[in-house]
Amino acid sequence: MTLQELVLRTASVYMDRTAVCFDEGNNQPPVCYSYKALLSAASELSHFLIAHCDFGGIREIGLYCQPGINLPSWILGILQVPAAYAPIDPDSPPSLSTYFMKKCDLKYVLVEKQQLSKFKSSHETVLNYDTVSVEHKDLALFRLHWEDGRVSTVLGDRADQHKVTDREDRVSAESRTPEKEHMDMRHDGCLAYVLHTSGTTGTPKIVRVPHACILPNIQHFRSLFDITQEDILFLASPLTFDPSVVEIFVSLSSGACLLIVPTSVKVLPSKLADILFSRHRVTVLQATPTLLRRFGSELIKSTVLSAHTSLRVLALGGEAFPSLTILKSWRGKGNRTQIFNIYGITEVSSWATFYRIPEEILNSAVKHESPVQLGSPLLGTVIEVRDQNGSPVLEGTGQVFLGGKNRVCFLDDEMTVPLGTMRATGDFVTVKDGEIFFLGRKDSQIKRHGKRLNIALVQQVAEELRQVESCAVTWYNQERLILFIVSKVDLVKDCIFKELQKHLPAHALPDDMVLIDTLPFTCHGKVDVSELNKIYLDYISSQPRNELHGKEELWGKLQYLWKSILCLPEDPEDTLKVPANSVFLDSGGDSLKSMRLLSEIERLTGTAIPGLLEVILSSSLLDVYNHIVQAVFTPEDRKANRSYTTKRKFSDADPEEASGKPARLESAWPSNHAGETNSVIALSRGSQVLSLGAGRLLTQLGLCLPVCSLDLIPQTNTQILKSLSPPAPDENLEKPPLFQQGSPVVGAMAMALRERWRSDTGKCVDASPLLVRAAVQDKPSTTVYIGSHSHTVKAVDLSSGETRWEQLLGDRIESSACVSKCGNFIVVGCYNGLVYVLKSNSGEKYWTFTTEDAVKSSPAVDPTTGLIYVGSHDQHAYALDIYEKKCVWKLNCEGALFSSPCVSLSPHHLYCATLGGLLLALNPASGSTVWKRSCGKPLFSSPRCYQQYICIGCVDGSLLCFTHSGEQVWRFAAGGPIFSSPCVSAAEQEIFFGSHDCFIYCCSKEGHLRWKFETTARVYATPFAFSNHPRSDDALLAAASTDGKLWVLESRSGELRSVYELPGEVFSSPVVWESMLVIGCRNNYIYCLDLLCGDKNNQV
């Protein structure tokens, strides 16, 4: 049985009844089709498609259209070919639509004629297509031609990067046993439709849904909701959201009427309510809680769930179900609507469980605190709850797994799937007395102030406050809990905070609250978290800078904050003053409230105040006041304080800094002409060291490079040097608040890491740091250069953490920077396809070079010629002469270049690797190909030279070694994909790298395993080998796993010396200079950590 057969069988009985109505909401009569007209239009389309499509494989047809009267007939027409329909939303970002079409390898797309110009303009830059000369009524058929099977998109790159392991993460182990019976999507008529997940929690997944998977949903809901030909069902979901399939086919397979309205009407609550419940008398509504909330509590109570409503069935799903308290407040007196909680995931399309709220609970005056259970499995569905070890959970907390014999879908590149496959949902639940209660998604479980918190709890408590119409909570930048409120009345924030304090534990109280007119929602009807984050960013930016006009005003406002946060008695006339000797902890404060007070004071003063937290926790109100006065009102202190401010988003940016000009510092070293050479030493990921004219610098310093791999250093510059004691940490530097710090993990051995400083970039930092050591007026100085997804490149002083300059580029930055041969320029790639050349002492833009796609590859400098080499996702490698501001040569490498080029001095070769799996050796002077080898799978890892060999990691889990003439010497097999680049030891005897199997590996130069160390997550970053300077024979290795842990190992044995956890994911690679480790983090910060040995006061 198929979906179309289900409709055909029903339609034959109800040919003259209304099947579909489309109401544009313009006070004109709706357009309606009977079942007879529906089938006739579908049949005409299917004949047209059969005549003009030559599939030659899996039959899938894209459908690019807006909701309209023809929508059901178009879907039926495609299904009757038979083929699967693949909906494409014209309002989606073109990059997402392109990714979807490419990933599905769609050969045909039906485009609604009204959307033709939009389709062409959105996709002409990345697609080659020919329009079939024959058109069909309101549709045009496009045949797509994908060049060489490749279209480079940002999403595609992200998907390639993670697809290998993601599928294994989501399919349970027992599903992969060979004896299982399989479902094969290549069988004729197997597939019904193809969708993609939203991508809000990662890379969008392609989900191909068989008829056998979705049919049980249709059959069960028809029975559960008791659907008849008298019912009217509303198409609330967009085609790209799989609940739309249930809405369409439950209606059309029952002889009922399907009501469709334009997308523009769905965002107008009053008009939508009028159309649904006055004009058409809708009887069955399946929607997300967010869509329902948009009506507002008054409209819900008076119309949607009134005593006389037409609505028989309300099924809420796709998000956490509202609390019973809220639900009961929405119901008008005498309402009899049946209300269901339905739950499911797109990967097991569409719904998995249902629970009807008992009438006696809805009518009860007793307040129910417990959440609503998920209920029973739907027809053919199996639900399991497992702990982190995969064992069944009968009581307690675990993750939901969903499946069933035929309830299986094909994810991404899967062609066959074992029947009964169970998919991990990422949703956590509690099992109590045999019932399952939803807790939240994995990403809604956060660790805050050292305690586990489900942010859904905050939303539930806030929503139950009488002043709150609706609300949402976000974990902004993984560091601030923000409550967004749509209010019924004018609100005073302090009143809400006081109410929340009565019902929430201290660690669950929001950091901030924003009042908004309405909650933004996605096209799927869910709360749009990314839009909320933008609203909060705008809210922060719009806050006026607080300028205190004297110490008296500070004292008054400090009194107000003190009383407000401690919930002291209200004083309308402000006559009750807080005694000056009051101590915060003795007055009802705690460590969490002290954090809020600190945040409010820093917002009041517009700057961070070193040492204030300790004063709040240990001293009197007067001491707090005096500490602030000293920091804010003394010019010297104010100047010092601004230099170390990390909370930049709460203060106005310096105009010079925003323009990329140097802020607060003179030039880092003399501003030479482009042709003149500064003496510099540059360190970058993988222990790569570049020494450029550094003889004078090294002589001045009386020292040399850290022990590390020197393959980029001209032999004339390599020397054996003494160690350097690092500068002592600046006593004025203040550690950031504890809840934002990384924390050393218990059990660290003989070594520790301590935060020296951190610098806020505004968004995730995936690039790796470049450290440049130079002499400024005969005084050595080291600068960290790094870019972030905030579009900015920062130059930061290594010792103090002081920002030397910031420069805003045109888009996100994932590329790591390199230094020019003269030392005067920093070169970095950008998502907008440009390569930027910036002056190293000021950040001023010196030159930009344009490629045809994103540049994520990190540039490399040729120390002999000064040429800059870089790869682009436009599949070309480029050689740039930055002094002449010209491209010397470019070469098509037959695949996008994500990894960084590698320069070999002997022989003089340039090595490049592509996502198409090619490793190329090029002539650096001309760009001609010396040789190329196919590695079979994408190469994200960057090539690395040592002795007479070159090695590189591959996503098939292999570390490959070649000679400089291109002969493969050996292949080492890791247990998972390798994205990490190799790091070579100082003696060039060992090679270190990480793998997605969660291990750090050490191989001999001959490709034999020396040791491997298991971390707690995937190892994406490149390790860094260095020496423990007080004991120069103590060789160490620093590496990072994606869960934010930094690992310091003994490089000869793999023995753990220390581990430290950052408060965010890490894809940046560490770089170590002397005893300071620098790395970027996805919590928006660059971190510098001191390596401490034995006695914590002695640095490594």
From Swiss-Prot:
Entry-linked InterPro entries: AASDH_AMP, ACP-like_sf, AMP-bd_C_sf, AMP-binding_CS, AMP-dep_synth/lig_dom, ANL_N_sf, Beta-ala_Activ/Resist, PP-bd_ACP
EC number(s) given by UniProt: 6.2.1.-
GO molecular function annotation: acid-thiol ligase activity; ATP binding
Domain of life: Eukaryota
Residues modified to O-(pantetheine 4'-phosphoryl)serine: 591
GO biological process: amino acid activation for nonribosomal peptide biosynthetic process; beta-alanine metabolic process; fatty acid metabolic process
Segments for region (Disordered): 162-181, 643-671
EC class of the enzyme, as a word: ligase
Domain spans labelled Carrier: 552-632
Induction notes from the record: Has been shown to be up-regulated by a lysine-rich diet. However, levels of expression have also been shown not to be significantly changed even when diets differ markedly in PQQ and lysine content.
Amino acids binding ATP: 197-205, 427, 441, 526
UniProt similarity note: Belongs to the ATP-dependent AMP-binding enzyme family.
Role description: Covalently binds beta-alanine in an ATP-dependent manner to form a thioester bond with its phosphopantetheine group and transfers it to an as yet unknown acceptor via an amide bond. May be required for a post-translational protein modification or for post-transcriptional modification of an RNA.
Full protein name: Beta-alanine-activating enzyme
Organism: Mus musculus (Mouse)
Phylogenetic placement of the source organism: Eukaryota, Metazoa, Chordata, Craniata, Vertebrata
Gene field: Aasdh
